[in-house]
Design a protein with these regions (language model features):
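Metallocofactor- and cofactor-centric catalytic cores in central/energy metabolism, strongly enriched
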Residues: 2-132, 137
């Protein structure tokens, strides 16, 4: 099959933080997906995650993604070669990856994890305050 004709099967396991936890196990059990996708983020969620990180720097991600959703399907995902895509890392994607790696190690499951970073603007705020630019320059 050429790349042009390749079919990619994507299963949407969640649409928001707090969505039902039954989707991921059902999709994985079906064996009919190549990618399992979790969407956790919305403006309110980001605010909650930022508050959690302020209290405990290792937090700031959707903990249930690791402790509930992935723990339930991790072995099967690996066995079936399903790739997982998620934005559950919130304001601490590396913390989410570290927590997931710890669960994988605990379960004895080999796991490769990629992390996308670069959109955290909080470190820029002190410099912006010092520069005191007019609002129109920040747009």
């Amino acid at each position: 099959m050429t790349a042009k004709n390749k079919t990619v099967r994507i299963g949407g396991a969640s649409g928001f933080w707090g969505d039902s936890s039954v989707g991921a196990p059902q999709l994985v059990a079906s064996g009919q997906i190549d990618y399992l996708v979790f969407d956790y983020l919305a403006e309110l969620t980001m605010s909650i995650l930022a508050g959690a990180r302020l209290k405990k720097p290792e937090l700031g991600y959707a903990t249930d993604f690791v402790t509930v959703a992935m723990r339930a399907v991790l072995r099967d995902v690996i066995d079936k070669g399903i790739r997982v895509v998620s934005n559950a890392g919130g304001v601490n994607p590396q913390g989410c990856a570290d927590a997931l790696a710890a669960v994988a190690a605990e379960l004895g499951v080999p796991l490769r994890i990629a992390v996308v970073t670069g959109d955290d603007v909080l470190p820029l705020i002190p410099g912006l305050r010092e520069a005191d630019p007019p609002v129109r320059q920040l747009q």
